[in-house]
């Protein structure tokens, strides 16, 4: 594919999602190119990101469900041993970092870690393999293969990463209000970090405190989502740039980068999980 397109077209093709949305003047349709996808704005859905994220979520649930069905107290198989190791790893991190009493946090952390890891893992597939298959299927259906877009790494889509981070943010707000009450939650936003014994001075400080605390609060989901997106997007872009090089150089660079990238995809899943645990712990804490 790289040989049939210019460098710019090749990179743009691999970084464009399979998008369905509302295009002004043409109605609801699948975007024919990156310009149409951009013109759709917020009235669009990235079908490939949805397909892969939901599919990998089902794979995660299916694997853990099958292991739970066949669990044995004797010598475990390789799959059971791997699942038990992951569960124990996540559980230990929750015990060490979460000070609340909710039983939701451990399953939440496990889901986040494994799901993000599986989505990140797709970045290790050859960059042209799945898009080439998608292009051939599109050609059989009468479409121009150069205008068939199919990204396979959901975490390189900010809609996915920010969607997950703002879902965590909703839980943070819920547990903050649940544990501290509405008054306590509002007090955290308006009475800290600056306080005064003089009530008039305290009233003056309320808008300042609110601005500072609100920015701190809203920065949590934004930084959580963009950190994952930025690291995975950069990793995917490097793989694409390597694919543009001569064949003999590709192997010399792609293998070391893929080995190093295994650390990145695992680390990013771990960081997202740990920050979720810490944020939920802070939300459940009655101390400020």
Swiss-Prot record:
Location in the cell: Cell inner membrane
Protein's UniProt keywords contain Methyltransferase: no
Regions that span the bilayer: 47-67, 104-124, 157-177, 199-219, 237-257, 258-278
GO BP terms in the entry: proton motive force-driven plasma membrane ATP synthesis
Alphabetized InterPro entries for the sequence: ATP_syn_F0_a_bact/chloroplast, ATP_synth_F0_asu, ATP_synth_F0_asu_AS, F0_ATP_A_sf
Pfam families: ATP-synt_A (PF00119)
Primary localization: membrane
Record flagged with keyword Transmembrane helix: yes
Subunit structure: F-type ATPases have 2 components, CF(1) - the catalytic core - and CF(0) - the membrane proton channel. CF(1) has five subunits: alpha(3), beta(3), gamma(1), delta(1), epsilon(1). CF(0) has three main subunits: a(1), b(2) and c(9-12). The alpha and beta chains form an alternating ring which encloses part of the gamma chain. CF(1) is attached to CF(0) by a central stalk formed by the gamma and epsilon chains, while a peripheral stalk is formed by the delta and b chains.
Function: Key component of the proton channel; it plays a direct role in the translocation of protons across the membrane.
Name of the protein in its database record: ATP synthase subunit a
Gene this chain is encoded by: atpB
